[in-house]
């Protein structure tokens, strides 16, 4: 049986308080990461002190599913700025070579199915939030907003961040299962058929 996992990350610092904003994935920090393991049917939780173990877990997996993991979660986990990650320079080139063949990023697949280049964000790519896609496709809604997670973390409400992250991970797992079985998501009221691989 292949080692398939689902990963979701919550950050320590808000985008607004971080110089460089969304591009500064190297400065956001891992507050909590949750990994659902299909083989064990268990959720594993990683904190800021467990980042190296989290990296090793991802590199050991055969398939990694998630939502916007390629452009966000992975660079945050490895502490690499988004521009460096996207350019594939330095350390990121080796990491990307290891992760790319096993990466099942649902958001990238949605963008590709719409004819967008998933590595170049443009205005038309909006409207594909996890809450909207999961709500329309599998009837699952998020229990909060990702922008709140770093605020909770800074307030010391770590269990609240864990609960939120674990819930997102379960939604991403269930959405992955649906896509693997049926091959599409509901996006803007219509079936959107996804490519097998991004």
Describe the role of every protein-language-model region.
Residues 133-197:
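Acidic, Mg2+-coordinating catalytic module of metal-dependent nucleases/exonucleases
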Residues 18, 76-77, 129, 145-146, ...:
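A short secondary-structure junction signal
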Residues 8-10, 105, 168:
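Acidic active-site catalytic centers that drive phospho-/nucleotidyl reactions
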Residues 1-63:
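Conserved RNase H-like, two-metal-ion catalytic cores of nucleic-acid enzymes
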Residues 38-129:
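Conserved DEDDh/DEDDy metal-dependent 3′-5′ exonuclease domain
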